[in-house]
Amino acid sequence: MSKILVIDIETKPILSYHWGLFNQNISLEQIKEDGGILCVGAKWLGGKNCHFFSEWEHGQEGMLTATHALLSEADAVVGYNSTSFDIPRLRGRMVEHSLPPLPNLTEIDLLKTVRKLGLTSGKLAYVGPFLKIGRRY
């Protein structure tokens, strides 16, 4: 049986100094603190336990190391916009912390499926109620 991991990350913003609010081009020299991954939530499909790793509880390296271990066990990874956002962000931060490259992952990005439906919006706040899934249903 395949091991399928459902995953989501939350990120923090880039902090910068700049001189206005309209039409700003922020240079690298203006960045005070680079944004990064704040936390990772993951659950094995069919499993009962959720895994939660955070910068404040595990530190950046601990969070990434634990996430790397889960992803390395997975036959496939499921997420929402994960192919364009979550997985590349994780790969980049893992390189930053000298973790070994992740194995090739079979990625199932649910946003790609939702886009085929031609809905008004692909945002989860719209898709959940439209499909009658989520906390309220």
Positions of the model-derived regions?
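Conserved RNase H-like, two-metal-ion catalytic cores of nucleic-acid enzymes
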Residues: 1-72
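Conserved DEDDh/DEDDy metal-dependent 3′-5′ exonuclease domain
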Residues: 46-130
